[in-house]
């Protein structure tokens, strides 16, 4: 699948790009980043020639929270744990970067600066490993594919995507977008 990144659409270019690529057929859209405004996609639909189907990922996410409260509570606990990890990481990163700047001011360049930068990279790597570990533990304990509500939504999203000639992801809240894209297995 070809990817075309358009950026902000203050002056819409989507219709022009769709025409120039020869796009024909149904287009799946994701407006989950708009959150409660997800269904307000008439302008987007118009730009696509009304040949679109909104995957309604935000609505599906809300449905999972309502119909599978245990999963939703576990997901909130994960979000809180990841938030705490992020807060501690940012605190540590701030001091590590201050050390880099201090070494640069004192030593200019050379091995001391390289070592300070390496310490920042090690901190980044450790943070990514810890987040990966938290997520892996969550998905092992709460396997989304085994949750009936999620599995049903995943199947419907897969069906809609299988009939689509293209996928358009509108902007919005990046955290909500990544969460819903992952939960409903859009990349599969």
Listing of model-derived features with the role each one plays in the protein:
Residues 1-168, 173-176:
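Extended, subdomain-level signal for the structured scaffold at the beginning of enzyme domains
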Residues 174-184:
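Glycine/threonine-rich flexible loop motifs
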Residues 186-188:
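Short alpha-beta junction capping motif
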């Amino acid at each position: 699948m070809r990817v075309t990144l358009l950026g902000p659409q203050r002056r819409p270019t989507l219709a022009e790009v769709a025409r120039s690529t020869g796009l024909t057929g149904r287009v799946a859209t994701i407006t989950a980043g708009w959150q409660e405004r997800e269904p307000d996609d008439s302008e987007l639909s118009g730009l696509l020639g009304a040949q679109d189907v909104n995957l309604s990922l935000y609505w599906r996410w809300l449905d999972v929270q309502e119909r599978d409260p245990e999963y939703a509570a576990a997901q909130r606990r994960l979000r809180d744990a990841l938030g705490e990890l992020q807060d501690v990481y940012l605190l540590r990163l701030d001091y590590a970067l201050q050390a880099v700047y201090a070494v640069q001011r004192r030593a200019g360049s050379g091995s001391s600066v390289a070592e300070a930068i390496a310490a920042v990279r090690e901190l980044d790597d450790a943070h990514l490993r810890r987040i990966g570990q938290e997520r892996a533990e969550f998905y092992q304990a709460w396997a989304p594919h085994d949750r009936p509500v999620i599995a049903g939504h995943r199947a419907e999203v897969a069906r809609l995507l299988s009939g689509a000639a293209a996928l358009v992801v509108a902007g919005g809240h990046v955290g909500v977008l990544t969460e819903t894209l992952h939960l409903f297995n859009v990349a599969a």
